[in-house]
Curated annotation (Swiss-Prot):
The gene is fbp. Pathway: Carbohydrate biosynthesis; gluconeogenesis. It comes from Paraburkholderia phytofirmans (strain DSM 17436 / LMG 22146 / PsJN) (Burkholderia phytofirmans). Substrate binds at D119, G120, S121, S122, N210, K276. This is Fructose-1,6-bisphosphatase class 1. One of its GO terms (cellular component) is cytosol.
Length: 338
């Protein structure tokens, strides 16, 4: 029987390094280490109650959110996997108030790693897909990293990705040269390329938003969602379906495959806050991926990747997915501002 030829993550990255010359060896190794950490997180997630990792940890993160046991474990896995390899100058996590400098006894590299170790963790105990989101930046030359070193607009990302821990464990990755999806072969322990050059469909009939917050929405979102809900009898003359998983990685992964728009707008409950999702840990990496797949991502007024971060845990409104839909809801926001 002929041996089936499959492209592993390692093979893919080495080929990219040879063909495009835009993937330095240190960055390739860093991505592989992050991918290995995601495999470890996937293992613990899949153990569920058998691994004694479900439930809350009795603590809160810097966002004031109750931490799950798996939140803390996933954060530790990513820190420990990446601190010693010599590829990083520092790390920042949604679960930590301050950035994590590489310990003095380890060599330092030229990259910064930013991550949400376990996105959608409110779904852990009910066995709904959750995931890890990460972003890689260059540390300014010759600098000992400070918080300011991390505060770069999303256009400066050199790589971004997310893992989804669901029926299959998948890793979606961009290094600025398109988007590819790898599926974890649990028997071999390898990430295998299963989707190349992913493209978000331009036309869509699906949208993702938490409709329970409808009474708090601002007029541009009310107008846009109202048109979708009106269906064939409304101005869009087409029926739309709403999908909401409450796990950003799962919602975005569906949109990447089937098209649609993901929305987490600012609302009237907290008018002093520009949104709920974190610019550095969630919005920027997802915006990079979505744009590389032919989609768009804005905060309702401007391109997410152009936003200059002011703090590590800055929040932002998010509209991302199929370009035509993102452009439309963004236009409604801009018209309201006039």
């Amino acid at each position: 029987m002929a041996l089936q030829r499959r492209t592993t993550l390692t093979k893919y990255l080495i080929e990219q390094q040879r063909e495009t010359n835009n993937l330095p060896a240190d960055l390739r190794l860093l991505i592989e280490v992050v991918a290995r950490a995601c495999k470890a997180i996937s293992y613990h997630v899949s153990k569920g109650a058998l691994g004694d990792a479900l439930g809350t940890a009795g603590s809160e993160n810097v966002q004031g959110e109750v931490q799950k046991k798996l939140d803390i474990l996933s954060n530790e896995i990513l820190l420990e996997a990446n601190e010693w390899g010599g590829n990083l100058a520092g790390m920042a996590s949604e679960e930590m108030e301050q950035f994590f400098p590489i310990p003095a006894n380890y060599p330092k590299g030229e990259y910064l790693l930013v991550f949400d170790p376990l996105d959608g963790s409110s779904n852990i105990d009910v066995n709904v897909s959750i995931g890890t989101i990460f972003s890689v930046l260059r540390c300014p030359d010759g600098q000992q990293p400070t918080e300011q070193s991390f505060l770069q607009p999303g256009t400066q990302q050199v790589a971004a990705g997310y893992a989804v821990y669901g029926p299959q464990t998948v890793l979606v990755l961009t290094t600025g040269n398109g988007v590819n999806c790898f599926t974890l072969d649990r028997e071999l322990g390898s990430w295998v390329l299963t989707q190349s050059d992913m493209r978000i469909p331009v036309e869509t009939r699906e949208y993702a938003i938490n409709a329970s917050n409808e009474r708090h929405w601002y007029p541009p979102v009310e107008q846009y969602i109202g048109e979708l809900k009106a269906g064939k009898d409304g101005p869009r003359q087409s029926d739309f379906n709403m999908r909401w998983i409450a796990s950003m990685v799962a919602d975005v992964h569906r949109i990447l495959n089937r098209g649609g728009i993901f929305m987490y707008p600012a609302d009237k409950r907290t008018p002093d806050k520009p949104g709920k999702l974190r610019l550095m840990y969630e919005a920027n990496p997802m915006a990079f991926i979505v744009e590389q797949a032919g989609g768009a991502a804005t905060n309702g007024e401007k391109r997410i990747l152009d936003i200059q971060p002011k703090s590590l845990h800055e929040r932002v409104a998010v509209f991302l997915g199929s370009k035509n839909e993102v452009d439309r809801v963004t236009r409604y926001h801009l018209e309201t501002k006039k």
